[in-house]
Regions:
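A short, surface-exposed alpha-helical micro-motif characterized by mixed small hydrophobic
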Residues: 208-210
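ABC ATPase "signature
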Residues: 226-227, 235
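Catalytic Walker B motif of ABC-type/P-loop ATPase nucleotide-binding domains
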Residues: 166-169
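Conserved signature/switch motifs of ABC ATPase nucleotide-binding domains
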Residues: 140-143, 160-161
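Helix-to-loop junction immediately C-terminal to a conserved catalytic motif
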Residues: 53
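ABC ATPase NBD coupling module
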Residues: 70-86, 110, 118, 232-236
Length: 361
């Protein structure tokens, strides 16, 4: 459905180095999927979405939507191709002087004026209001709607001309948690009922966990990692996998305590009935804290099996999280283990397919 082939976008700067906003980006988004694009500010997300909507032309490369290279189109052909792409903004960007229904109808009156009669437009508006759960609010003005309701109107407006692709630019970042969950559920419903391909630009990994089938991580204009959720989680030590399943919270003082070497005073206190220990020997009496990530793909233990293994190895589970994303169950544990058994325990955990790191402050 969507293919970016070696796409670069470079902005020349007079008297300074050029700004490379996108750097040889290659990406495939499957038809009918929900794909997340994540990254910090300056990663290239905004430039990418402007290129996808053909508001910006890439300096190099091709952007293909439904087998049409947008970067090669001009004039009327480009305007027609853009109609295949609907856009949902961070703020709904509704016309304040128009009702919800009139906002939804507006694209049909402008871009498709000759293709629909007035009655056909009104019927389309009724269908879309029902789809987004606002069938009784079509006559309300934006000022009379909540933030979540305004975003629903924005989604309906983006769908008015029956696009094949729906681009969502930070669609939930201005919403409260309850409205965020409702909008994400609506987007999934829209995909399921219409078959539209959805691309979500976001900095919130919770959005990816909740709704996406696949995800791409951008950094400095390039792709760091990309794949389906299952592919990403199959490599639990990868940057995206670590972001998708955050490390369970452990008090920093506990982390420091688990990783510290015993002080000379503690060494002396332990030496009443034995020869004083050296610092190196004493450090072997302490604990260290491990960060363990595992998934339930074939050949890897489930969460309960991993907990049983941790207990068998003498590890103390100080915190843990378990998530189900797509067809994969993924878990992340903070394990306190005896420093003297570090190598043996880490080897046994890794032998079971877990990704293991020593946590530090």
């Amino acid at each position: 459905m969507i293919d970016l082939i070696d796409v670069s976008k470079i902005y020349p700067v007079k008297g300074s180095d050029d700004v490379v906003a996108l750097d040889h980006v290659n990406l495939h988004v499957k038809a009918g999927s929900i794909h997340g694009i994540v990254g910090q500010s300056g990663a290239g997300k905004s430039t990418l979405i402007r290129c996808l909507t053909a508001l910006e032309k890439p300096t190099f490369g091709s952007i293909i939507v439904d087998d049409i290279d947008l970067s090669q189109l001009r004039g009327r052909e480009l305007r027609q191709a853009r109609r295949k792409i609907g856009m949902v903004f961070q703020a709904a960007n509704l016309f304040d002087a128009k009702t919800a229904g009139e906002n939804i109808e507006f694209p049909l009156k402008v871009a498709a004026k000759k293709e629909f009669t007035r009655e056909e437009r009104k019927e389309r508006v009724r269908e879309l209001l029902a789809l987004v759960g606002l069938e009784h609010r079509g006559g309300a003005y934006p000022s009379e709607l909540s933030g979540g309701q305004r975003q629903r109107v924005g989604i309906a407006r983006a769908l008015s001309d029956t696009p094949q692709v729906l681009l969502c630019d930070e669609p939930t970042s201005a919403l409260d948690p309850e409205s965020t969950r409702a909008i994400l559920s609506l987007l999934r419903q829209v995909r399921d009922e219409t078959g539209v391909t959805i691309v979500i630009i976001t900095h919130e990994m919770s959005v990816v966990r909740e709704i996406c089938d696949s995800v791409t991580l951008l950094k400095n204009g390039g792709i760091v990692q990309s794949g389906t959720i299952e592919e990403v989680l199959a490599d639990p030590g990868s940057p995206l996998a670590k972001e998708l399943v955050p490390a369970p919270s452990v008090d920093e003082l506990d982390v420091a305590d688990f990783n510290r070497e015993l002080t000379d005073r503690e060494i002396a206190a332990q030496s009443s009935s034995a020869e004083p220990k050296t610092s190196a020997q004493a450090s072997e009496d302490g604990n260290i804290l491990l960060d363990v990530i595992f998934t339930s793909h074939p050949g890897v233990p489930t969460g309960s099996n991993m907990l049983n293994l941790a207990a068998k190895l003498g590890a103390d589970v100080t915190a843990g999280t378990f998530e189900s994303m797509g067809s994969v169950q993924v878990g992340r544990l903070a394990l306190a283990i005896p420093a003297a058994q570090r190598s043996s325990i880490i080897d046994q955990l890794r032998a079971q397919g877990a990704h293991v790191e020593v946590r530090s402050l």
